Structures are given as structure tokens and as C-alpha cells.
From Swiss-Prot:
It comes from the Viruses. Interacts with host IRF7; this interaction inhibits IRF7 dimerization, thereby altering its function in immunity. Interacts with BRLF1; this interaction modulates BRLF1 function. GO terms for biological process: symbiont-mediated suppression of host innate immune response. This is Protein LF2. Prevents the establishment of cellular antiviral state by blocking the cellular IRF7-mediated innate immunity. May also inhibit viral replication by modulating BRLF1 activity. The gene is LF2. It comes from Epstein-Barr virus (strain GD1) (HHV-4). The lineage of its organism: Viruses, Duplodnaviria, Heunggongvirae, Peploviricota, Herviviricetes.
Amino acid sequence: MAEAYPGGAHAALASRRSSFRNSLRRLRPTEKPDTSFMRGVWKYEIFPSYVRVTNKQVLQLDAQCQELPPCPSVGQILSFKLPSFSFNTTTYGSRYFTVAFLFFGAEDNEVFLKPFFVMHSAPGHRAKRPESAQPVHREREVYLVHCAHQIGQEPLPLPADSARAERHSADTLLHPERGQAKHQRAPDLPQWLSRHQPGRVPALPAGAAHAPISKVIRPYSHIPGEGMSGQRHTPR
């Protein structure tokens, strides 16, 4: 078997493991979103554990691109955060979440279309790629990652018009005796997005730190369970 694969037995074993993982993914039922809606050329799909934003156009993602989701530039996507909000109680309970943008994609390599997750709102929490998120060739996907809000944590920079809602939500959680409901509902995702179309977004506060893309997106070889380091796969 080793002679049939370049690189010897180790490459052969890695190839068999990759084929087995792909066969399991094909058997996994397709997860359907709870809600989906369009904003311009972007399709937003809200799943129980994550939100997917897809643009089926082939884009050149740079700081001047006007077809990005609500965010001033690609470099700022990685540290941009929507207001804290409470999901539908029948689906998620009364937990509060914070979300952060992350984009990733490559046209010539299918493996690189798999999303990499960055968790800004909970430093000790390890975000995982949703098992049902399948790479699609020649599509650009943006993922919103959310996690339970940590009370007392220093908030990330917010757009000016949503910072007030974020502070109010955190304040009512920390100090419910100050009045109003303990679980004050902040603006929900569709309403907030409807006010901030791509290309017409508020600037982030001056001095807000934005992590360089090269420092945030990990190389493909560093992801556990995704095959051999440096191994390339071309789209079928």
C-alpha cells in the first residue's frame, strides 16, 4: 500500500483517515437554519450554534471592498462585535451572547474554505468549527461566532450607536437592582443589520485595537484532525 502513495506509509494512512472523515460527513444530516434572510448580496443563516453569512460571488477581499458584511474593512472584521443580545427563549433560553466576525476562503484549494474560528469574547473558551459546516468551492463565507457572555469581562470596541445598548445589557445583568428587567433585550441581529448595510457602516471608536489577519488566522497545518501538515487538496 505504501508504494501506491507518494511519501510512504505515513501518507497512505493519512489519506485513508481523510477519506474516512469525508465519508462520515456525507452521512451526517444537513443542518437547517432556524432563520435566514438576505441583506444586499449577502445571505444570513442563523443556526442553533452559529450564524453563517455567505456571498456566492467570487470576491477580492480587501479593505476597499464594498461588498463585505457590516464592517469598515477586512482588517477590522476580526475584532468587530455586534451588540450583546438575547436569543429566542424557546430555542436558547435567556443567555446573553457576544459575537465576532471571521472570514476565510481560498479559490484554488478546497481545504482552505473551511472556516477558522476566533473567540474574542471569551479568552478561555475554545471555539470549534461546526461539524455541519461544509466547504463550498468558489464561495466566500463569513462566520459569526457566539459564546456565553462572561459577566464582568471588559467589552470589545463597539460602533457608537450600539455601544449604549451593550453597556445597558451588561449593566442590568451585573446590577439588576438598578431597575428594569434582569434580562433586558438588546437589538436583535436582523434589526441591527437592517440599519447597517454593507458599505454604509459606522466607524469603530478611535484607538480600537485590530489584530492583524496574519496573527489571528491560524495556518491550515495547525488545525487538529484536519490531515497532514502541509498537505494540499484540490477541489474535485
